[in-house]
Amino acid sequence: TVLAKPAEQTPGVARVAVDLLHAAGVPADALQLLHGPGETIGAALVAQPQVAGVVFTGSTPVAKLIQRALAAKDGPIVPLIAETGGINAMLVDSTALPEQVADAVVQSAFRSAGQRCSALRLLCVHEAIADGVIEMIQGAAKELVAGDPSQLATDLGPVIDAEAFDNIQR
Protein backbone atom coordinates (compact mmCIF):
# COMPACT_ATOMS: atom_id res chain seq x y z
CA THR A 1 0.00 0.00 0.00
CA VAL A 2 1.18 3.50 -0.85
CA LEU A 3 0.23 6.29 1.52
CA ALA A 4 0.57 9.58 -0.33
CA LYS A 5 1.01 12.68 1.87
CA PRO A 6 1.25 15.77 -0.34
CA ALA A 7 2.56 19.17 0.67
CA GLU A 8 0.01 21.20 2.60
CA GLN A 9 -0.16 23.68 -0.30
CA THR A 10 -1.24 21.05 -2.85
CA PRO A 11 -4.24 19.10 -1.50
CA GLY A 12 -6.42 19.73 -4.55
CA VAL A 13 -4.00 18.58 -7.22
CA ALA A 14 -3.05 15.56 -5.08
CA ARG A 15 -6.72 14.59 -4.78
CA VAL A 16 -7.19 14.86 -8.55
CA ALA A 17 -4.04 12.78 -9.21
CA VAL A 18 -5.13 10.02 -6.83
CA ASP A 19 -8.67 10.04 -8.25
CA LEU A 20 -7.24 9.65 -11.77
CA LEU A 21 -5.05 6.75 -10.67
CA HIS A 22 -8.02 5.05 -9.02
CA ALA A 23 -10.12 5.62 -12.16
CA ALA A 24 -7.31 4.05 -14.20
CA GLY A 25 -7.52 0.89 -12.12
CA VAL A 26 -5.18 1.34 -9.17
CA PRO A 27 -7.10 -0.21 -6.26
CA ALA A 28 -8.14 2.14 -3.45
CA ASP A 29 -6.46 -0.08 -0.88
CA ALA A 30 -3.18 0.11 -2.85
CA LEU A 31 -3.08 3.93 -2.93
CA GLN A 32 -4.44 6.14 -0.20
CA LEU A 33 -4.21 9.89 0.26
CA LEU A 34 -3.53 11.54 3.61
CA HIS A 35 -3.67 15.30 4.10
CA GLY A 36 -2.18 17.28 6.94
CA PRO A 37 0.94 18.93 8.29
CA GLY A 38 4.16 17.02 7.76
CA GLU A 39 5.15 17.65 11.36
CA THR A 40 2.27 15.49 12.58
CA ILE A 41 1.00 13.29 9.73
CA GLY A 42 4.39 12.75 8.09
CA ALA A 43 6.16 12.11 11.38
CA ALA A 44 3.49 9.61 12.45
CA LEU A 45 3.69 7.77 9.12
CA VAL A 46 7.48 7.48 9.19
CA ALA A 47 7.36 6.09 12.75
CA GLN A 48 5.08 3.18 11.83
CA PRO A 49 6.74 -0.26 11.95
CA GLN A 50 4.96 -1.30 8.73
CA VAL A 51 6.82 1.32 6.67
CA ALA A 52 8.98 -0.47 4.10
CA GLY A 53 10.29 2.63 2.32
CA VAL A 54 9.93 6.41 2.13
CA VAL A 55 10.07 8.66 -0.92
CA PHE A 56 10.25 12.34 0.00
CA THR A 57 10.42 15.57 -1.97
CA GLY A 58 11.00 18.74 0.02
CA SER A 59 13.55 20.57 2.11
CA THR A 60 16.90 19.21 3.22
CA PRO A 61 16.19 19.83 6.94
CA VAL A 62 12.99 17.76 6.76
CA ALA A 63 14.76 15.01 4.80
CA LYS A 64 17.36 14.85 7.57
CA LEU A 65 14.61 14.56 10.20
CA ILE A 66 13.07 11.67 8.26
CA GLN A 67 16.49 10.03 7.87
CA ARG A 68 17.13 10.23 11.63
CA ALA A 69 13.66 8.90 12.45
CA LEU A 70 14.13 5.93 10.12
CA ALA A 71 17.63 5.22 11.46
CA ALA A 72 16.30 5.14 15.03
CA LYS A 73 13.72 2.45 14.23
CA ASP A 74 14.24 -1.14 15.31
CA GLY A 75 14.20 -3.80 12.65
CA PRO A 76 15.40 -3.80 9.05
CA ILE A 77 16.84 -0.68 7.47
CA VAL A 78 14.11 1.36 5.77
CA PRO A 79 15.24 2.89 2.46
CA LEU A 80 14.78 6.63 1.98
CA ILE A 81 14.75 8.34 -1.40
CA ALA A 82 14.91 12.09 -0.84
CA GLU A 83 14.82 14.78 -3.52
CA THR A 84 15.64 18.06 -1.84
CA GLY A 85 15.76 20.57 -4.67
CA GLY A 86 19.34 20.40 -5.81
CA ILE A 87 20.77 22.88 -8.24
CA ASN A 88 19.86 21.98 -11.80
CA ALA A 89 22.66 23.29 -13.98
CA MET A 90 23.11 23.77 -17.72
CA LEU A 91 26.59 23.91 -19.24
CA VAL A 92 26.75 25.45 -22.70
CA ASP A 93 29.84 25.13 -24.88
CA SER A 94 30.84 27.33 -27.80
CA THR A 95 29.26 25.03 -30.41
CA ALA A 96 25.73 25.35 -29.01
CA LEU A 97 23.05 27.07 -31.05
CA PRO A 98 21.98 30.17 -29.09
CA GLU A 99 18.34 29.77 -30.17
CA GLN A 100 18.19 26.25 -28.73
CA VAL A 101 19.91 27.36 -25.53
CA ALA A 102 17.51 30.27 -25.03
CA ASP A 103 14.49 28.04 -25.60
CA ALA A 104 15.77 25.35 -23.22
CA VAL A 105 16.62 27.93 -20.54
CA VAL A 106 13.20 29.58 -20.71
CA GLN A 107 11.39 26.23 -20.72
CA SER A 108 13.34 24.89 -17.75
CA ALA A 109 13.64 28.04 -15.66
CA PHE A 110 10.19 29.57 -16.11
CA ARG A 111 7.64 26.82 -16.75
CA SER A 112 5.66 26.01 -13.61
CA ALA A 113 6.80 29.45 -12.41
CA GLY A 114 10.21 27.92 -11.75
CA GLN A 115 8.76 25.86 -8.89
CA ARG A 116 9.68 22.38 -10.14
CA CYS A 117 12.58 20.70 -8.43
CA SER A 118 14.07 20.25 -11.90
CA ALA A 119 13.87 23.94 -12.82
CA LEU A 120 17.10 25.46 -14.11
CA ARG A 121 18.99 27.28 -11.36
CA LEU A 122 22.53 27.66 -12.74
CA LEU A 123 23.56 28.55 -16.29
CA CYS A 124 27.20 28.43 -17.40
CA VAL A 125 27.80 29.66 -20.96
CA HIS A 126 31.09 29.68 -22.86
CA GLU A 127 32.32 33.25 -23.16
CA ALA A 128 32.52 33.03 -26.97
CA ILE A 129 28.71 32.90 -27.24
CA ALA A 130 27.63 34.29 -23.85
CA ASP A 131 26.57 37.77 -25.00
CA GLY A 132 24.33 36.44 -27.76
CA VAL A 133 22.80 33.77 -25.54
CA ILE A 134 22.09 36.27 -22.76
CA GLU A 135 20.47 38.65 -25.23
CA MET A 136 18.23 35.87 -26.60
CA ILE A 137 17.23 34.71 -23.11
CA GLN A 138 16.36 38.26 -22.10
CA GLY A 139 14.27 38.68 -25.24
CA ALA A 140 12.47 35.39 -24.69
CA ALA A 141 11.82 36.18 -21.02
CA LYS A 142 10.32 39.56 -21.94
CA GLU A 143 7.84 37.77 -24.22
CA LEU A 144 6.50 35.52 -21.44
CA VAL A 145 2.89 36.22 -20.51
CA ALA A 146 2.08 36.09 -16.80
CA GLY A 147 -1.48 35.37 -15.79
CA ASP A 148 -4.15 32.78 -15.19
CA PRO A 149 -2.66 29.32 -15.88
CA SER A 150 -6.02 28.03 -17.13
CA GLN A 151 -5.66 30.34 -20.15
CA LEU A 152 -3.66 28.93 -23.08
CA ALA A 153 -1.91 32.26 -23.68
CA THR A 154 -0.40 32.22 -20.18
CA ASP A 155 3.25 31.19 -19.95
CA LEU A 156 3.87 31.99 -16.30
CA GLY A 157 1.31 31.31 -13.58
CA PRO A 158 1.28 32.19 -9.90
CA VAL A 159 3.65 30.84 -7.29
CA ILE A 160 2.28 28.44 -4.69
CA ASP A 161 2.21 30.65 -1.59
CA ALA A 162 3.44 33.84 0.08
CA GLU A 163 6.67 32.17 1.20
CA ALA A 164 7.53 31.28 -2.41
CA PHE A 165 6.76 34.85 -3.46
CA ASP A 166 9.02 36.21 -0.71
CA ASN A 167 11.85 33.89 -1.84
CA ILE A 168 11.57 35.26 -5.37
CA GLN A 169 11.70 38.83 -4.10
CA ARG A 170 15.00 38.19 -2.28
Where do the language-model regions lie?
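Flexible, active-site-proximal loop/turn residues at the rims of small-molecule/cofactor binding pockets
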Residues: 8, 37, 57-60, 129
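Conserved donor sugar-nucleotide recognition element shared by glycan-biosynthetic enzymes
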Residues: 10-13, 38, 164
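ALDH superfamily catalytic-core signature
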Residues: 23-25, 47-48, 53, 60-170
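A structured beta-alpha segment of the ubiquitous adenosine-cofactor-binding alpha/beta core
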Residues: 32-55
